[in-house]
Amino acid sequence: MALKHFNPTTPSTRGTVLIDRSELFKGKPVKQLTEGKNKSGGRNNHGRTTVRFRGGGHKQSYRYVDFKRRKFDVAATVERLEYDPNRTAFIALIKYEDGELAYILAPQRVKVGDRVISGAHTDVKPGNAMPLGAMPVGTIVHNIELKQGAGGKLARSAGTYAQLVGKDAGYAQVKLQSGELRLVRGECMATVGAVSNPDNMNQHMGKAGRSRWLGRRPHNRGVVMNPVDHPHGGGEGRTSGGRHPVTPWGVPTKGYKTRVNKKTDSLIIRRRKSGK
């Protein structure tokens, strides 16, 4: 889908660039596939802030999206494409031949009326799901499982994808967009194609209020706070912080590695590219 550029008729429309969602379904989601959703405001069960700068926003309902795609050898038709407030990608409502409805992540180049299917061996066509071991090398995939039957975990955000670059000894070699090359069991499911809405990264909100509608509150820098609030705070007049950048809790940031080693590190052939 394309981008919408606005004429600067008001200060808030100047420079605004939004996603054109005119082709998406405009009604309500399927009721049996949705659930009410309470807002946390970034607080945990003790009422303490665990994620800063969250709160408010439009009321949302959660859509149950099928990340497992384990209904094998039953074809489904794409009924409609929908907006989902819980993720950056669009979702597709599919109807199986036996009448069951489900939501899946909408891949690019899939439109209303297309047929998709999951199975041990299916056509390599956007929207079809199959084990990585059954796909030809070079296939572009998304919604990749890390454990068999656990549902897709990798490449689920708008416009993302991974590439199957090799197969060896029961494992598939998958190259992620970050540059990481890792091994995934060949029995793990993945969906062919890239995730929809690749222009999501090119949006420009245009005004603070649009971020507030999404539940994002203003993000404040540490150097403008008081010493009680942040290690960079305080000082007479404007200061540059006076120390190497740290988080509000004193942990070094901006390039400092915080990743904890784990058993599955042995499945990573090449690490993702450094941010520097």
UniProtKB/Swiss-Prot annotation:
GO terms for molecular function: rRNA binding; structural constituent of ribosome; transferase activity. Gene3D superfamilies: 2.30.30.30, Nucleic acid-binding proteins, Ribosomal protein L2, domain 3. One of the primary rRNA binding proteins. Required for association of the 30S and 50S subunits to form the 70S ribosome, for tRNA binding and peptide bond formation. It has been suggested to have peptidyltransferase activity; this is somewhat controversial. Makes several contacts with the 16S rRNA in the 70S ribosome. This is Large ribosomal subunit protein uL2. PROSITE patterns: RIBOSOMAL_L2. Residues 224-254 are annotated as: Disordered. Pfam families: Ribosomal_L2, Ribosomal_L2_C. Keywords: Ribonucleoprotein, Ribosomal protein, RNA-binding, rRNA-binding. GO terms for biological process: cytoplasmic translation. GO terms for cellular component: large ribosomal subunit. Belongs to the universal ribosomal protein uL2 family. Part of the 50S ribosomal subunit. Forms a bridge to the 30S subunit in the 70S ribosome.
